[in-house]
Amino acid sequence: MTEVSSLTGRLLVATPALADPNFDRAVVLLLDHDEEGSLGVVLNRPTPVDVGDILEGWADLAGEPGVVFQGGPVSLDSALGVAVIPGGGAVDGAPLGWRRVHGAIGLVDLEAPPELLASALGSLRIFAGYAGWGPGQLEDELVEGAWYVVESEPGDVSSPAPERLWREVLRRQRSELAMVATYPDDPSLN
């Protein structure tokens, strides 16, 4: 098997051609990617459920909108916390209960007391479920043209307007991808 170049910390942006309704115009932050598979969370699928309804202690730390996001179609009954540490979270200064994924972005131990992290977190999102791919599956989807792979920015995790994130991420690209942001929601109405 060939070695897999890690895409951990990067974004998968669904191409307009991706037909899976779970990922229509999705922006996925890859939390882990190696030869054993990939795991990520969809950053732009807010649910109507308030964070306080399922994780009361974390509600005050959740960014706006303060709702749970559907992280993907796998394990919808599990919760993941993704947070940004202001200043990039220096290696020796990473707070207890937070594990770096990429740069200032990391996973939060939701079993830890929220007050342990309250002063350290810049923004927090809670996700129900995740997106997962088996060995080689994501690579196959990339070859098929289902996803664009782009760099993430810490603000992507806590976008106050998640419904605009797909277009915003594409617009900031310095390539022909910026033009894809203008693609109509329903091309048949064009």
PLM feature segments, named:
Residues 1-190:
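A short aromatic-anchored loop/beta-hairpin motif
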